[in-house]
Amino acid sequence: MDPGQRPNPFGAPGAIPKKPCLSQGSPGTSGSGAPCDEPSRSESPGEGPSGTGGSAAAGDITRQAVVAAITEWSRTRQLRISTGASEGKASIKDWIVCQVNSGKFPGVEWEDEERTRFRIPVTPLADPCFEWRRDGELGVVYIRERGNMPVDASFKGTRGRRRMLAALRRTRGLQEIGKGISQDGHHFLVFRVRKPEEEQCVECGVVAGAVHDFNNMARLLQEGFFSPGQCLPGEIVTPVPSCTTAEGQEAVIDWGRLFIRMYYNGEQVHELLTTSQSGCRISSALRRDPAVHYCAVGSPGQVWLPNVPNLACEIAKRELCDTLDACAKGILLTSSCNGIFCVCYHNGPVHFIGNTVPPDSGPLLLPQGKPTRIFNPNTFLVGLANSPLPAPSHVTCPLVKLWLGKPVAVGKLEPHAPSPRDFAARCSNFSDACVVLEIMPKPLWDAMQ
């Protein structure tokens, strides 16, 4: 064998590898001690471990043990990923809380006295306000203590910070709720520390974090309204002057309320006007103990989807039940005179169409967990002023339409979660959705009466 040539684990080229023995015994032998390529003749077939029945039973036991070991490993791995914990190390949640409490890093600090929200500096490297000790050192500490890789010169930038932020966003015990810029020009992200009760139930985590989502969307509507990152391609952006009179303030309050229609399989089942000014959460009801779960009571501005009506078609009824079960975490909406923002937690595809969608485009797929502006009243009002009788189009329509699809099934041949590209490809047919929502700001609904 050449010095650089590696040995072939399957023997010589062209040789037929021996089948491993599934029964218990020493390597290379059967359960009775005979070689694996020569069946044992000490017992007749079907009698004892070396027989046909014994080998099959031993093989089934071995397969079950392997499947159990793989299942336990997968469960442990998912738990380790969700909590950020590893052997001999604390969880990511406990680690970052310890770093915030230490006060060693400028800008890494608590945002409230209850110590439920903290800031992480994220000033870009090219920004003149970038400071290594504030914006980069914590990322290097993360790599050194938890990254399981050597720290070299490449981590002098923001590479370590990017890895740390990715780990924080994957952690179930933390929730990214916003971002901002301090008075001295430094950028930061805001994370919320979830309560232990929220980590046991995914719906409870969404309900408890709904207030923070509402505040984040309200901030985007007020401050980040003209940010290019919040605008879709081809979207028209026109500012609205602030109102200072009493009538103007009342009108601003009305813009925070929404008129909602709900359709099941093409038939209207419910309509309502929301009462909360901060926002609303549309979800299906869950039968859980209110003393233990937040999700049984709902968030502020809770809107429950109606129960499944009596349908003659069992297939349609089953699809409707699956869609409502997928909407347990729900959809969050916040409205103002600057538009409507939405955060989708629906466990399935949700398509929407409104005047923020380009005129030559069809319904778009809502991203999961990301604030998205789905309606701009300024576009509707400006278009109405320019043309009293505009052509029928979703750009000139005063409402938003949402199609809630059933969960995307993962095939038996692909046990992994679908990639975003595959997910979008499977969700391309929005017409299959059996739950449809029509959402309109209250002032526009009042004007149409």
UniProtKB/Swiss-Prot annotation:
Q: Name one GO cellular component term.
A: host cell nucleus
DNA-binding region as annotated in the record: 89-195
Query: Could you tell me which InterPro entries the record lists for this protein?
Result: Interferon_reg_fact_DNA-bd_dom, Interferon_reg_factor-3, SMAD-like_dom_sf, SMAD_FHA_dom_sf, WH-like_DNA-bd_sf, WH_DNA-bd_sf
The record's subcellular locations are:
Host cytoplasm
Region of interest (Disordered), residue spans: 1-60
Positions carrying N6-propionyllysine? K406, K442
Give the free-text PTM comment from the record: ISGylated. Propionylated in lysine residues Lys-406 and Lys-442, which is required for effective inhibition of IFN-beta production and antiviral signaling.
Single annotated GO MF: protein sequestering activity
Tell me which domain of life the UniProt entry assigns to the organism this sequence originates from.
Answer: Viruses
UniProt xrefs under Gene3D superfamilies: 2.60.200.10, Winged helix-like DNA-binding domain superfamily/Winged helix DNA-binding domain
Q: One of this protein's GO BP terms?
A: symbiont-mediated perturbation of host cellular process
Q: What function does the entry list? A: Plays a role in the inhibition of host innate response by repressing the expression of interferon-inducible genes and blocking host IRF1- and IRF3-mediated transcription. Blocks the interaction between host IRF3 and CREBBP. Regulates the host cellular metabolism by increasing glucose uptake, ATP production and lactate secretion through down-regulation of heterogeneous nuclear ribonuclear protein Q1/SYNCRIP. Mechanistically, induces ubiquitination and degradation of SYNCRIP through the ubiquitin-proteasome pathway by recruiting KLHL3/CUL3 ubiquitin ligase complex.
Q: Which PANTHER family match?
A: INTERFERON REGULATORY FACTOR, IRF TRYPTOPHAN PENTAD REPEAT DOMAIN-CONTAINING PROTEIN
Q: What is this protein called?
A: VIRF-1
